[in-house]
Amino acid sequence: MKFGMNLLLWSGGIEEEHYPVLDMLKEAGFDGVEIPLFAYDVGQCAALGKKLDELGLERTAVTVRNEEDNPISPDETVRAAGVDLNKQALDCCQALGADFLCGPFHSALGIFSGAGPTADELSWGADSMRAVAEHAATCGVTLAVEYLNRFECYFLNTAENTARFIETVDHPNCKMMYDTFHANIEEKGIADAIRACSEHTVHVHISENDRSTPGTGHVDWDTTFDTLKETGYEGWMMVEAFGLALPELAAATKIWRRMYESEEQLARDSLSFMKSEWAKRG
């Protein structure tokens, strides 16, 4: 098992000013970090990758899509823009040295139609993702497609329908991830959800119900860790939490009150929680 920290707690773009955070996370005992990719600067990613290599920190990356580059849009030009930007994100992953590109890059974040996904949208989404997966293969990167709760997207909302989507895409570089925050909202049974997608799951976000320190809220952690162990999961456990460090990021993630002492406290306590819970399960 590898334990990591998503850097969105500090910023939506990691630059030299954030290098002390990387130093702290290495000292704390993390195996790696998750890099937000919202601006696709290959040179900057290469420099960051060098810093991470120096520290001995592994890395994954996360990105999203918006309305103007929605891979399930009825407009072919918009879909093509989404595919192109996802490919740019993969180029950045290659420069960064990231093995996984995670996130809800299957559709536009926060955009709704007033209904669930149509047959056309599912077809467009699969075609778009298959094209991205082809590029991922050339970059040596695996896609970890993330489903979100119904308040953030309408395309993929459960482990079961995401697993079906992955099977429709049918590409070895297209897999999925499981996020405890979204599952806590959408799934009727956590164990059944994890089992339903275990064949395709390559990444896990450890995220509390209020997006603060894992282990301090009401996510069903015992069932989560028990079932991950039962299904033989051995990939990343990546903490995803959000705070007030950047006003624009706080607004996007609907955070307006402080729910932890400090970012460092959250990171250290989260790592201790994950390690202790996993150790209990042999």
Model-predicted regions and their roles:
Residues M1-A98, H171, E199, R257-G282:
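N-terminal pre-domain/capping segments
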Residues M1-S11, E15-K26, L156, E160-Y178, ...:
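Histidine-acidic metal/acid-base catalytic patches
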Residues L9-S11, L37-A39, R65-E68, F105-L109, ...:
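Active-site-proximal loop/turn and secondary-structure-junction residues that shape catalytic pockets
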Residues E15, A61, E68-N70, G103, ...:
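Short acidic/His/Gly/Ser-rich catalytic and metal-binding motifs that mark active-site loops
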Residues E34, A61-T63, C102, A144, ...:
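Conserved beta-strand positions in the central sheet of alpha/beta enzyme cores
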Residues Q44-G56, S128-A136, A193-A196, T223-L228:
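Catalytic-core regions built around general acid/base machinery
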Residues C45-L48, I72-P74, S113-G116, L156-T158, ...:
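Short secondary-structure transition/capping segments
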Residues E54, E76-K175, E187, R257-Q265:
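Active-site acidic/histidine proton-transfer and metal-coordination neighborhood
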